[in-house]
């Protein structure tokens, strides 16, 4: 008998600064509910919601703006399992299956992480190399895979 995993549909954004393509700096934020965990904006896709609508909604909820333009989309859905310390909190899900987008902040867009339900308490725009140095959690392999793909395609 096969044990099927129950993955939560999710969308994630790699947000480039508005100075892209002249400068390639990527937004990364520190979670307010976990110690020293930096990540990209992401969130669940509501039932009946399109992936792109979820992308814009999650950006507005997490970073205070949806003023972005989509540059590229990762061609596959990527999944990961929740670590044991958070799996109970996320019940009935075993992990998430994510669709990644590469987006650029529009000129004049303002980041505001002090949202109605803040998920982050700090953020930075950093280089690709710095991203790899800052990520030290269970999503690191996915981050590396997605960023390498966008690098190989010439986007970053």
UniProtKB/Swiss-Prot annotation:
EC number(s) given by UniProt: 3.6.1.-
Residue intervals of the Nudix hydrolase domain: 6-148
MF (Gene Ontology): pyrophosphatase activity
A Pfam family: NUDIX
Entry-linked InterPro entries: Nudix_hydrolase, NUDIX_hydrolase-like_dom_sf, NUDIX_hydrolase_CS, NUDIX_hydrolase_dom, RppH
Nudix box, short sequence motif: residues: 43-64
Keyword entries, A-Z: Hydrolase
Cofactor: a divalent metal cation
Cited function: Accelerates the degradation of transcripts by removing pyrophosphate from the 5'-end of triphosphorylated RNA, leading to a more labile monophosphorylated state that can stimulate subsequent ribonuclease cleavage.
Alphabetized NCBIfam families for the sequence: PRK00714.1-3, PRK00714.1-5
HAMAP family per the UniProt record, alphabetical: Nudix_RppH (MF_00298)
Similarity field: Belongs to the Nudix hydrolase family. RppH subfamily.
Designated name of the protein: RNA pyrophosphohydrolase
Source organism (scientific name): Campylobacter jejuni subsp. jejuni serotype O:23/36 (strain 81-176)
Record gene name: rppH
């Amino acid at each position: 008998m096969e044990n099927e995993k129950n993955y939560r549909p999710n969308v994630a954004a790699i947000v480039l600064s508005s100075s892209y393509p002249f400068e390639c700096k990527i937004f990364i934020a520190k979670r307010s509910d976990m110690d020293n965990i930096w990540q990209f904006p992401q969130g669940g896709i509501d039932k009946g919601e399109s992936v792109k609508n979820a992308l814009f909604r999650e950006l507005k909820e997490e970073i205070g703006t949806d003023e972005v333009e989509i540059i590229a989309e990762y061609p596959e859905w990527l999944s990961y399992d929740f670590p044991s310390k958070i799996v109970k909190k996320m019940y009935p899900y075993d992990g998430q299956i994510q669709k990644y987008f590469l987006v650029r902040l529009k000129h004049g867009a303002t980041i505001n992480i002090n949202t109605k339900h803040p998920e982050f308490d700090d953020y930075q725009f950093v280089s690709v190399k710095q991203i790899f140095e800052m990520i030290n959690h269970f999503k690191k392999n996915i981050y590396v895979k997605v960023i390498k793909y966008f690098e190989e395609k010439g986007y970053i």
